[in-house]
């Protein structure tokens, strides 16, 4: 915490000064926190004695700022009454919302960002700062001093939001005060401001374009090592589409219309972003931005910016090669169309493409390709879809290695070559970026392996569901078969007992024996032990895969090497600031050592990762191969179940048919006994019985004449009553389905229990 300047109190009522946030051309900015509410505000005090013109502009600027309400412009707040006395002069204080994540310069200064921000961060900057600039211009405000130091970051609902600060109202842009007003910020000023010409909103286009370029590549576009007075004379004759100028070893300036490598941008974004920069970095202020669009009345550069931000881009990581492919989606494009484009670029046939989201969910062919893009999420580093080749269970390569920047390749080959520290700073920055990139590549591939594992677990869940279904149906079939076999054996036994004196049917008996044999054959269908063993073995494999150390991230060594490279880079930056000439040159042996170790370590962890991934894919393929077997088994079980039920129903019908015959016979006997007549069949039956009776012992012979007739009538009446009762019960149960009926009455014990009634 820095000591407050003279006349400034650290405590103002309930407000306590915590630290100095920054210093500008006109004042200091301090952080104050309310001890009662914990609210934080940034307070800016004007520290210079200004002339009357600038005093008026300072005061007017504060009033204007209080009227601005936009997410991407810092919000002005009322100054607490307790702080009114801390002003260093008679000028009002400016209180603003406090943005806790620092400024854009702080983000760009991180060693891992020395070759540019991540694509998602670049797109977020384009969206936020572009929106803020347009809002200011719509309110007739030109910022004139856009630079990374004047873009602050605030976290809102878990998302980083960029906000424009220091709107520059107190800056007098006449030639005499230019140097005092813009100390340290001239690199971002539009060329016309150096020439004292009149200016328009296009000065903000130039500053914004310069910031975009630096965020993409890590350095400013035009001779970034030179002062503006030096580079403006060399750059003024650049081509209308040139967006970069560098000086070669011979001192010759070379221009380019493209963004340099290394950067972190996808191929799909690179070209439209270069087009945007070509509009914003035109030297001619009249041509800059390309005028207003006739339809939207927006500057053409912001129309193009909106088009870039509205692009739906699918980023695909090909796990067979480690290469990232980006595809710009057309409106309502289907997944089939996207897969055809993937096939053309990766040579993986459409039917063999397995597109997995981070959660392991497969892309749905019935849904549009936009399912591969998350709403509100931009950049290939934020969300990516993983592509697997279903025809392979082992990935052997070749894996696409990250491109080594030319300058880094030079120091790897010429390790001991002494180079100027200023040159080494740029080269080592690219080396740090390369090492960070190797670690990020591994992290993405590990996420791909994790997606494959989650997909395997989803398949395993389905396998378990199928297994449980198969087991349930198998047990049901076994139960029905046991009942059917027990029933038919009992029926055959009882049929044999009564066939000598009751009803007989050779056709029915043959059908019963055939059904018994078929039921015995179905017992084999119900046996699923072999499949159960395969499934249990697969479950064990998957558990072992989950327990494997290779199922967890193995990038610890790479993280340590990255930190070592960053530390070497920081040490080099410190040397660059030392005036001692003996520190003016150095070799790259230490940095090259870290590069080589990182590459070797990445090779090792990738070998382990792909070995583990191959096991995951093999287990998944085993599950896929099992599904048809299980489905066929389920079909066979269902067919057997249906057949057994049909056989049982057929036997039920036969029983009812027998019952019908028995009822008809008893009805006929009753009619004969009442009329005194007897059908020929019954007469024949009686004659046969009489013959049999004559051969029986005296104790078993049928009574004669009147006694016999009375006894027969009574017996028939008793049987008729019992049959009538049985038919009545059957009629009442007729509405119930056969399956819902209680079959226990068919068991032997039930029949024995009921036999007294018969």
UniProtKB/Swiss-Prot annotation:
Enzyme class per UniProt: transferase
Keywords: ATP-binding, Cytoplasm, Kinase, Nucleotide-binding, Nucleus, Phosphoprotein, Serine/threonine-protein kinase, Transferase
Pfam families the record matches: IKBKB_SDD (PF18397), IKKbetaNEMObind (PF12179), Pkinase (PF00069)
Record-level GO cellular component terms: cytoplasm; IkappaB kinase complex; nucleus
Statement: the UniProt record of this protein carries the keyword ATP-binding: yes
Main location, first listed in the record: cytoplasm
CDD domains, per the entry: Ubl_IKKA_like
Region (Leucine-zipper): 456-477
MF annotations from Gene Ontology: ATP binding; IkappaB kinase activity; protein heterodimerization activity; protein homodimerization activity; protein serine/threonine kinase activity
Active-site residues per Swiss-Prot or TrEMBL entry: 145 (proton acceptor)
Reactions catalysed: L-seryl-[I-kappa-B protein] + ATP = O-phospho-L-seryl-[I-kappa-B protein] + ADP + H(+)
Region (NEMO-binding): 741-746
Subcellular location: Cytoplasm; Nucleus
Family membership: Belongs to the protein kinase superfamily. Ser/Thr protein kinase family. I-kappa-B kinase subfamily.
Complex formation: Directly interacts with ikbkg/nemo.
Function: Phosphorylates inhibitors of NF-kappa-B thus leading to the dissociation of the inhibitor/NF-kappa-B complex and ultimately the degradation of the inhibitor. Phosphorylates 'Ser-10' of histone H3 at NF-kappa-B-regulated promoters during inflammatory responses triggered by cytokines.
Protein name: Inhibitor of nuclear factor kappa-B kinase subunit alpha
Organism: Danio rerio
Source species taxonomy: Eukaryota, Metazoa, Chordata, Craniata, Vertebrata
Gene (name only): chuk
